[in-house]
């Protein structure tokens, strides 16, 4: 949510993340910058906030590609109906890129049908990973699993164990909940939990982050799997967000889903970045040397915010936490 109280919305402390973004652009002076946020900024009173943001970019010496666009990740092979506003800022005097054209679509089943059912493994009640061999056939899933090369991926190849299912800590449901999940038709919303049940040949609904601890630490509703009477795992959500299987998330479900829900789907981010590469005249080459994964300190995946700040030497209050309004 954005506050619009006061003379300038950008000056309101409740809008501090956007303020810090503009501050970093001013200080770092990149040639190009990209801003992504919810499409609600383009309608109603929030348009004022958007106008102020564009003015702030212009005052910092940047042109903004107009008209701005709301892009749907589903148009860029991400199996998720996720619409987000994108602003592209360009240092004045440099060429403006275009917004990316759609590249195609992927279905839910094409993304996650190969993943083993987490409920089969007792180990996943206490740990978020387990060793298991499984077959993957669809190109989208094969690329995310590292079994097939992606000609548009210029990142370092990763050397990791594709037969280890990670980020798959189980969620325990009551038998009553499982019966309700089973009885809910695919593509519909379960009436009690209000969880959306995935349709294998459709798209996932928007994966959201939920609220932080200052606002009650509520988990955003997680989709119900189309085949199994349970909500999706973090790994399944990651596939539905276009993250590769080598990418690890926080070991807890709450933090793992927040990391995914707060992020730009990699395939959508790549499409936007690709347009900037074109105007820069970049000719990318994929590195040959793989990065070896699997030998790091996995305890880092369990850190809370204060532990992570202490470990990396970052002040924990660099961006102040929101305080709850208890006077209600």
What are these regions (language model features)?
Residues 3-188:
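Class I S-adenosyl-L-methionine
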Residues 139-328:
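C-terminal target-recognition/interaction regions appended to catalytic cores
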